[in-house]
C-alpha cells in the first residue's frame, strides 16, 4: 500500500480553509478524472493511448436502448461474461484502415474489454464502480485497467480491460470458485480464511499475496462492498512468474445502492458477515499467517490514505448526493474498526 503519512500529518496543521473542497473541476477525463482544458474529447490523448492503445477515443456506436437489446441477445446465446450485473465483451474492430479511429464492437466471450452499462435497478453503478477502483488505486491496491466511457446518447458506462488476454493469447487465470472446486451458484459459500489458504497453497508469492488479499478485504469493508464473493478473487499466471493474486476488479459499494443489505462482507470473516470488529480481522490475519503488526500497519496506511480517497470521490462523476452518502459510509466503517 502507499504511505501518505507525511502528507496526512502535514494536513493536520493546515488552516481550516485549506481543507475546503474545490467547487470547480470543469470537464474531466473519463479515465484519470483530471481536467480537460483544450480537447473536445472525453479523454486526454495520453489516457486514450494508455487504455485503448490509440490517440483517439474509439467509436462506441450504441445507445443505451440498443446496447441493452444486444446484451440481452448475447446473454440468451450464452456468450455474456459471467456475473449478475449486465456486461458485454468488446474488442477494437481490427479490419479498419490504420489511419481511421477504431470502433469498439460486441464480440461475445473473447473480447479485450468488458463493458457494464447502467443498471435498471441500481443508480449510478458505472460511476460508483469507477470511483471505487480509483480509490483502491490511490491506496496502493493493484487494480485492473478501467475507465468510464460514453455511448452515443452520452450515457456513461463502466469499461475494464481484461488482464487475462495479451497479443500472444490467453493467460491462465482461476478464480476462487474454481480453485475451491465449488459451483458458480455457491460463490457466496465460503470464508476469507479459506481463500487465504488457497492463496498459500497455489500462489508463487504466498505470504505477500495473502497480505495483498486482506488489503482488498479491508478496502471492501471500508467502501461497503458486500459482493466480493469467490469469483471476485482470482490468481493470474504471468509468463515465468507463476500464479499470483490478480489485480482487484468488480469493486462496487453495494451498501450504497442496496440499503436493505445488512451484511458487511460477502464471505464470512471469523465466522461473521455483520458487526465486524478489529478482533475479527486480527483472527483472520493470524489464520492466514500474518501477525498483529501487519494488521496494525495496514490499518495505519488506510488511515493516512483516507483523505486521498475522499479527494478522488469529490473529483468523480458520482452525484453530489451519493458523494455525501459514500463519504459518510467510509467514515462510519473506519470508526467501526477504531480509526478516526
Regions found by a protein language model. Give the residues of each.
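C-terminal regulatory or interaction extensions
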Residues: 171, 177, 252-260, 289-291, ...
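C-terminal hydrophobic structural anchor segments
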Residues: 252, 256-301
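A residue-level signal for conserved active-site and pocket-lining positions in enzyme catalytic cores
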Residues: 90, 136, 176, 227, ...
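Conserved ATP-binding subdomain of kinase catalytic cores across diverse folds
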Residues: 66-187, 245
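ATP-dependent phospho-/nucleotidyl transfer catalytic cores
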Residues: 152, 157-222, 267-271, 283, ...
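Short linear loop/turn motifs
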Residues: 149-155, 295-305
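Regulatory N- and C-terminal appendages and interdomain linkers associated
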Residues: 1-68, 72-75, 287, 311-340
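Conserved kinase catalytic-core segment
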Residues: 120-137, 186, 191-256
Amino acid at each position: 500500500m502507499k504511505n501518505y503519512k507525511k502528507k496526512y500529518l502535514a494536513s493536520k496543521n493546515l488552516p481550516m480553509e485549506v481543507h475546503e473542497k474545490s467547487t470547480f473541476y470543469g470537464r474531466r477525463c473519463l479515465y484519470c478524472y483530471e481536467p480537460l482544458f483544450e480537447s473536445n474529447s472525453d479523454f486526454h490523448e495520453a489516457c486514450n493511448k494508455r487504455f485503448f492503445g490509440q490517440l483517439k477515443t474509439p467509436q462506441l456506436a450504441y445507445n443505451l436502448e440498443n446496447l441493452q437489446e444486444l446484451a440481452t441477445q448475447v446473454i440468451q446465446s450464452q456468450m455474456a461474461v459471467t456475473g449478475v450485473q449486465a456486461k458485454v465483451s468488446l474488442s477494437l474492430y481490427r479490419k479498419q484502415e490504420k489511419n481511421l479511429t477504431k470502433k469498439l464492437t460486441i464480440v461475445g466471450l473473447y473480447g479485450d474489454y468488458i463493458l457494464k452499462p447502467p443498471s435498471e435497478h441500481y443508480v449510478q453503478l458505472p460511476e460508483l464502480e469507477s470511483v471505487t477502483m480509483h480509490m483502491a488505486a490511490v491506496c496502493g491496491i493493484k487494480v485492473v485497467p478501467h475507465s468510464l466511457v460514453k455511448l452515443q446518447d452520452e450515457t456513461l458506462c463502466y469499461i475494464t480491460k481484461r488482464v487475462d488476454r495479451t497479443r500472444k493469447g490467453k493467460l491462465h487465470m482461476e478464480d476462487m470458485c474454481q480453485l475451491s472446486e465449488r459451483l458458480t451458484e455457491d460463490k457466496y459459500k465460503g470464508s476469507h480464511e479459506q481463500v487465504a489458504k488457497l492463496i498459500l497453497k497455489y500462489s508463487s508469492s504466498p505470504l505477500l499475496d495473502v497480505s495483498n488479499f486482506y488489503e482488498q478485504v479491508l478496502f471492501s469493508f471500508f467502501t461497503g462492498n458486500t459482493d466480493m464473493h469467490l469469483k471476485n478473487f482470482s490468481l493470474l499466471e504471468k509468463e515465468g512468474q507463476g500464479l499470483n493474486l490478480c489485480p482487484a476488479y468488480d469493486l462496487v459499494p453495494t451498501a450504497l445502492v442496496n440499503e436493505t443489505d445488512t451484511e458487511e462482507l460477502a464471505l464470512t470473516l471469523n465466522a461473521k458477515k455483520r458487526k465486524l470488529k478489529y478482533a475479527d480481522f486480527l483472527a483472520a490475519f493470524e489464520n492466514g499467517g500474518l501477525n498483529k503488526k501487519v494488521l496494525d500497519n495496514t490499518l495505519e496506511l488506510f488511515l493516512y490514505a483516507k483523505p486521498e480517497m475522499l479527494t478522488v470521490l469529490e473529483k468523480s462523476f458520482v452525484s453530489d448526493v451519493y458523494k455525501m452518502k459514500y463519504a459518510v459510509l467510509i467514515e462510519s466503517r473506519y470508526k467501526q474498526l477504531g480509526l478516526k
